[in-house]
């Protein structure tokens, strides 16, 4: 009789654990990343150099399928230029400065099999890129996330990201 109680108890426990919802795993790519380097390859000499003299930026994957990216030229935040937001009468110098910053937000999907993350852009600093998709081949080298654009026009770029603390 005791063994029957143990068998029934074990069966109930096994059933209870099997009925729990499996939480989807959060991709390793999730989190806030700080740009360590953005390089461009000269295909004639096969030499890598800093893109636009050096870039800074952040990349956020929230674990719920949302992505945010902001890239900007080195020194962008220290230019000493001030202008009001949502105003169409800012100086030409400020307008030119804004073009040194690139950002978008959207949704993302990771294909582990292909090592590609797709960014579906919901908003963008460039109106012509609203609704477009960017694909990035990625891999990890230690604690560094390394990405290369799949699309031909940006395929000479390589971005290295470190997890922000």
Which stretches of residues belong to each language-model region?
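Lipid interaction determinants
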Residues: 19-165
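Bacterial Sec-dependent N-terminal signal peptides
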Residues: 1-29
């Amino acid at each position: 009789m005791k063994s029957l109680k143990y068998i029934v108890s074990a069966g109930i426990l096994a059933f209870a654990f099997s009925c729990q919802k499996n939480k989807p795993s959060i991709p390793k790519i999730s989190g806030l990343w700080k740009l360590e380097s953005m390089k461009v390859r000269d295909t004639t000499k096969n030499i890598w150099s800093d893109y636009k003299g050096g870039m800074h930026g952040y990349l956020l994957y929230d674990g719920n399928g949302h992505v945010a990216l902001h890239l900007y030229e080195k020194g962008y935040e220290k230019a000493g230029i001030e202008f009001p937001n949502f105003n169409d009468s800012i100086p030409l110098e400020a307008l030119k400065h804004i073009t040194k910053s690139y950002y978008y937000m959207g949704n993302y999907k990771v294909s582990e099999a292909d090592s590609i993350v797709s960014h579906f852009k919901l908003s963008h600093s460039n109106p012509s890129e609203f609704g477009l998709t960017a694909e990035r081949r990625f891999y990890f080298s230690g604690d560094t996330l390394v990405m290369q654009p799949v699309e031909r026009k940006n395929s000479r770029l390589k971005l290295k990201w470190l997890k922000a603390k």
